[in-house]
Curated annotation (Swiss-Prot):
Keywords: Developmental protein, mRNA processing, mRNA splicing, Nucleus, Phosphoprotein, RNA-binding
Protein localization: Nucleus
Residues annotated as domain RRM: 19-97
Gene this chain is encoded by: rsp-4
Protein's UniProt name: Probable splicing factor, arginine/serine-rich 4
Gene Ontology molecular function: any one: RNA binding
Phylogenetic classification of the source organism: Eukaryota, Metazoa, Ecdysozoa, Nematoda, Chromadorea
Amino acid sequence: MSRGGGGDRRAAPDINGLTSLKIDNLSYQTTPNDLRRTFERYGDIGDVHIPRDKYSRQSKGFGFVRFYERRDAEHALDRTDGKLVDGRELRVTLAKYDRPSDERGGRGGGGGRRRSRSPRRRSRSPRYSRSRSPRRSRSRTRSPPSRDRRDSPDRRDNSRSRSRSPPPREDGSPKERRSRSRSASRSPSRSRSNSR
């Protein structure tokens, strides 16, 4: 009858005086009777409870065992933490609150740990982005010296091209000289014909 509410009703009046152990990593096949058999050898047990889903009625994978004496609970913790039950290694810890807060704490405790991890991950992301931004700025500062280096050979090339530019201009002048020399050679022949 430990599965039903009868056992829970018996333990409810005195539950605040009990020392609770929270058992994590339970197999879905493990029942309250299985937990009772595992822990009752270490002392008198006042209550055993495994929370179940409202709709599927399936175990949530953790449970609670309450001892009348704190010494018995601590002794059971030392003996059962890491023990294999239904192929699972039990993780046993002292629970801080009674059953209602334990159930909420079990849900909220896991959620609280996950929430505490998420801001750390979020806080890391801006750090990486901030560390990357100065690297980009450094690359921008490095670009001007490379441009100066590129400008210097261009200037040299321009100066060379300017020094080479006069020869084609000189090529034009001999043509003019040839045309002038031809006109000069033709002019004396005309003067001779006139003399005749």
